[in-house]
């Protein structure tokens, strides 16, 4: 079973929490680390329990808190190489061990959660 919770949605910032039996992930981190922590705490999720952050694209309303939350809680980040290259202000602050690339249309796993990324033209 999957649980979803939209933490933030809109032009000011986007972040989605997804939970499976063994995985807890954030899809985008478009608000500050502090606001994302508060939102997670409000749904009784410990931010240090997050297994991964998936980045959909490099717009500020999707990555604002990326480097801070990844660094603070030592959370691996997953994105395409092109997305990483387009957000150097964020990625330069990430621990190298937490940088993970994926390719569109190639599934991968985060714990028991299968992820199948795709591109939208």
What are these regions (language model features)?
Residues 15-16, 57-59, 108-112:
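Short, solvent-exposed polar/charged micro-motifs at secondary-structure junctions
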Residues 3-6, 30-32, 53-56, 117-120:
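Short, flexible loop segments at the rims of nucleotide/cofactor-binding pockets, characterized by
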Residues 1-43:
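Conserved beta-strand hairpin/beta-sheet module of binuclear metal-dependent hydrolase folds
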Residues 18, 28, 57, 77, ...:
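Divalent metal-coordination and catalytic microenvironments
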Residues 81-121:
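Metallo-beta-lactamase
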Residues 34-83:
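Active-site metal-binding motif and surrounding structural segment of the metallo-beta-lactamase
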Residues 14, 23, 49-51, 71-73, ...:
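A generic structural signal for short beta-strands and their flanking turns/coil linkers
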